[in-house]
Curated annotation (Swiss-Prot):
The keyword Nucleotide-binding applies. The gene is Naip6. This is Baculoviral IAP repeat-containing protein 1f. It comes from Mus musculus (Mouse). Component of the NLRC4 inflammasome, at least composed of NLRC4, caspase-1 (CASP1) and some NAIP protein. BIR repeats lie at residues 60-127, 159-227, 278-345. One of its GO terms (biological process) is negative regulation of apoptotic process. It holds the Pfam family Nlrc4-like_WHD. One of its GO terms (molecular function) is metal ion binding. Residues 464-759 form the NACHT domain. Sensor component of the NLRC4 inflammasome that specifically recognizes and binds flagellin from pathogenic bacteria. Association of pathogenic bacteria proteins drives in turn drive assembly and activation of the NLRC4 inflammasome, promoting caspase-1 activation, cytokine production and macrophage pyroptosis. The NLRC4 inflammasome is activated as part of the innate immune response to a range of intracellular bacteria. The NLRC4 inflammasome senses Gram-negative bacteria such as L.pneumophila and P.aeruginosa, enteric pathogens S.typhimurium (Salmonella) and S.flexneri.
Amino acid sequence: MAEHGESSEDRISEIDYEFLAELSARFGMNLVQLAKSQEEEDHKERMKMKKGFNSQMRSEAKRLKTFESYDTFRSWTPQEMAAAGFYHTGVKLGVQCFCCSLILFGNSLRKLPIERHKKLRPECEFLQGKDVGNIGKYDIRVKSPEKMLRGGKARYHEEEARLESFEDWPFYAHGTSPRALSAAGFVFTGKRDTVQCFSCGGSLGNWEEGDDPWKEHAKWFPKCEFLQSKKSSEEIAQYIQDYEGFVHVTGEHFVKSWVRRELPMVSAYCNDSVFTNEELRMDMFKDWPQESPVGFEALVRAGFFYTGKKDIVRCFSCGGCLEKWAEGDDPMEDHIKFFPECVFLQTLKSSAEVIPTLQSQYALPEATETTRESNHDDAAAVHSTVVDLGRSEAQWFQEARSLSEQLRDTYTKTSFCHMNLPEVCSSLGTDHLLGCDVSIISKHVSQPVQGALTIPEVFSNLSSVMCVEGEAGSGKTTFLKRIAFLWASGCCPLLYRFQLVFYLSLSSITPDQGLANIICTQLLGAGGCISEVCLSSSIQQLQHQVLFLLDDYSGLASLPQALHTLITKNYLFRTCLLIAVHTNRVRDIRPYLGTSLEIQEFPFYNTVFVLRKFFSHDIICVEKLIIYFSENKDLQGVYKTPLFVAAVCNDWNQNASAQDDFQDVTLFHSYMQYLSLKYKATAESLQATVSSCGQLALTGLFSSCFEFNSDDLAEAGVDEDVKLTTFLMSKFTAQRLRPVYRFLGPLFQEFLAAVRLTELLSSDRQEDQDLGLYYLRQIDSPLKAINSFNIFLYYVSSHSSSKAAPTVVSHLLQLVDEKESLENMSENEDYMKLHPQTFLWFQFVRGLWLVSPESFSSFVSEHLLRLALIFAYESNTVAECSPFILQFLRGRTLALRVLNLEYFWDHPESLLLLRSLKVSINGNKMSSYVDYSFKTYFENLQPPAINEEYTSAFEHVSEWRRNFAQDEEIIKNYENIWPRALPDISEGYWNLSPKPCKIPKLEVQVNNMGPADQALLQVLMEVFSASQSIEFHLFNSSGFLESIRPALELSKASVTKCSMSRLELSRAEQELLLTLPALQSLEVSETNQLPDQLFHNLHKFLGLKELCVRLDGKPDVLSVLPEEFLNLHHMEKLSIRTSTESDLSKLVKFIQNFPNLHVFHLKCDFLSNCESLMTALASCKKLREIEFSGQCFEAMTFVNILPNFVSLKILSLKGQQFADKETSEKFAQALGSLRNLEELLVPTGDGIHQVAKLIVRQCLQLPCLRVLAFHDILDDESVIEIARAATSGSFQKLENLDISMNHKITEEGYRNFFQALDNLPNLQMLNICRNIPGRIQVQATTVKALGHCVSRLPSLTRLGMLSWLLDEEDMKVINDVKERHPQSKRLTIFWKWIVPFSPVVLE
């Protein structure tokens, strides 16, 4: 560490790319690409951050405190990071070493923080064990005093003499001034930053910036004569009162402690490990390989414990690992050889028996004399304490001292440290739970303020009567046992102040027992004994130096009198009590508490900590779990208590397959198994409790209730006083008039509700079945089934019975046709708050419905089918459920992946009931769907001049483009991380050989693909061969068809449709298409070239029924169609779009030979021979759809034949000009005869403008009308006519009303229209847009009228109002209406133009 100054930050790599490549292959993700990008971002952040030695973070406890807001979903615990020298910087997830400034942003499951630290910065002086001022998290300021100051007290009476002793004051302690220390009477001892008072001999260390030497002197050594000569008694008292923590504690309590110091707290690894104790290390070798040539006793003596993997052992202190032991190996020699800096080894050198503080690396200055530290020697310690005691008093002292030793011996035995988790977790290792820090908050009983505490802070504040509350299995017992162990082991100086620590389980005592009897029975065992008199004397004499750890508290009434008095009258004894109590039992002891500690949910990193230790031999299993939970964030909270983790450990240990099945329901099953084992003697009581709690959970779930009161519990039959209930529910009473009850988590509530629903549906009692059906039928829409109740239904399926399953399957498969429910989508807000990830899922599903109702239907159908089949197979009722399944499949379109379901292996004939199966193949050729140029529309426009308050109505295209580019980049990065997988054909139907039934129709969607690779080709060959009919839809995928030639040639007789957009067909691909004999539909659009070879030979497709060609700006399409095309008499759809002039005569001939024509679209620029075209069309009696655009239209000619099309459903004349009134009137009259018309896009022109009101009236005769569009023709009178017609009830089926670009309508006309429009129950889209030159600035009354209008349109989901200049107040009105609208979650308002200019702001 060069000069302890700025550290140069070289580029470092935290990533193990070899392992990452393995992980990528395992999970099908390109993690390497993601890691490189993340590493670059991290490097940039490192360069910005401050480097150099950080003296403020040399305290491990302070480092630990920085992790309070740290993300819990990590692989490293804060304790591991703080012990390795790291603190949380607050910059993302970055942690930094206080010494070498190493900055890490990532975690690693395979490498601990200390290992990563050593690898990246082996030169770090903290890691090398040099004195850099590290303060262990359990370390204390009070130090063992030197026996003699050289020259005696007199030498240091003068402040300047004391100041001279600080010549070598360490660099890391410069935050505390030597002058301030010397002024307060202290002399530097030369050891670390330890100082000693020349007068009282009190010794202090661990000085940090901001420390006040006088305050420390007064707190720890208030009787010092020098202190009392310089400070008044009031000042000293104030110093003590203001001191944080250590109430009633002085330095004497630490100096005269009876606790043996096992190790100095300077290790950078596991400095509170239980393995400091040899017996506990020995216990870990019970599975040591018998064939190993090295005895485990020697390994234990050398500081090692067994990891459980191969013959790998790890040092509890330095963390070093050794393996591959051979005959003749000496563990101690190898330990010294490979890990010479190990603190444990250095300690062994210092002393063979009593383990003192490590000798300083630095030479001692003249201020002190070096003498052997013997203050912890038994005789000296006893003498210093007993010197003035009488004989009877000396007896209690000796017995108390003996008792302390017996207690320490008890607490360091394996039998004490093992968790008492009967049967279900008997294999859980000693260090697995004791090594975890629980998350704790402190609540002062008289203050509502809560604060998070680290474990060192808890230990510093132990005083008087305190409780630690938590749910069942939250770790209360572990926490108390950990305190007892740390005290006994000598690993925790913070606890040295206690001479006696009693851990007592209150569940195994009787009210008539004496305290001494309880202690003897529980803690001392055979041969151990202490009298009530001696115990009483010890407590009275030691007072604050006695700590009671009372576990399993259930109430004051059940306590023996002695313990009752210690709690209720603690002011008489002044002992310290920490009582572990379930959350719902706190109330009766709250009056006696000073502080209440509450254990929070078990952080996920603690789960990883336990599993990593428990399954160190199978770390891949733990990696899978972490990835599973990273993908399912809602489930991370299920490991909310150590007991849940212990349950899953047992499940994994007993059931290897469970390691690959990370279902939360499995965890809950394991937890319930634990309860059944724990309470197997009272199985009926447990079942009754689970049933009643399940009823409460079920009622709450369907009423969105996750908090309950006593009345709710009573109604469901839940007994809140039964202990079993506490394992399922928690009680909260703080700051509440009435207690509130919650289940252990929202998911656990759903689990219990699922258990109860299955119980009801499987019951023999009709009342129970009816109640179960009542709840099931409340899931009355597909969205509820796949969203709000998705998790619940999966839980139900895990319990499904043969009696319940067919009922559930039948109900689920009927939901897909509940159209009314689909149109009333709304999420359960309370549920979404508890399951935020479910909200994202809901948004996706809702967005899918908005964009593509067809895709939504297929998606929902597949999801419901999968769920139904889970029920059927889990309950072995496939035969009973098959009638419902087969009925569901009939005529449906699903994704190809459903064929992997087991059902299609068992029942391949069901495939024939489907309409079709879809498969999507997506590449990474990015294609923008939007043309940014805007030249066509905007090139002749001048930027509008508007007032500043209306500028928000326009967004510059550059800003929009920037956002769009960012979205594209996100998509690209996502695609790089998740490579496109091949269609999965590995299970179910695909394992049948031969395949008895074929896919009726296969729809293949290909997007943004280049040529297919060999793997995809092989998949397509198999899928095509299993299909009767194949339809292609290709977008931006040039070269794809040629690459799958082998597959097409094998199945060319099956291809019936080919739709191609934005791709170029090579000559070879055109020839390939011409070999498809069964082609019935051909669509070509938006290509840059004319596929002339294909078009010249269209007549070879003898079965062709549909031709759609949309090629704007390309050569005349009609001219390249062969004359023989007219022989295709089966043509049903002909759609031609070209912007060039065309020869009409050929088209006329074609139409004359297409008697079955249903759809005719034409866009081109010619006016000749229009009459012959109309005559030909008039002969097509089956026409359902007509669309004209471009200059290919003579109005009168078309109007004359219009009445012939009595079957017409869609008529689009948008943009066609009707100039004269006579023709327009005839057109209006003809409309009345088109009784089946569903969509009408009215032409424009002066003539139409004059008869607009007549057209509206004629529309009243069109009962099927769904879409109605008027552009450029409406005025105030005609637009109000639409409103009146609607209000009269004439447009009941209307879904889309488009009256945009009607600039003859004034503001008053709009206002009248809004005020009158009503009675459109199905209207979903209303368009009132104007162009930019026709922008309109309206008054508040008009906006208000629009708001009222919108509120009267209950189905409205889209409102277009571009060029309506709205200020902030106007938008507030609109948004308020939107919030209150029945479709508020779906209603979208378009009011902002995207333009290539900025508006001119008027002064």
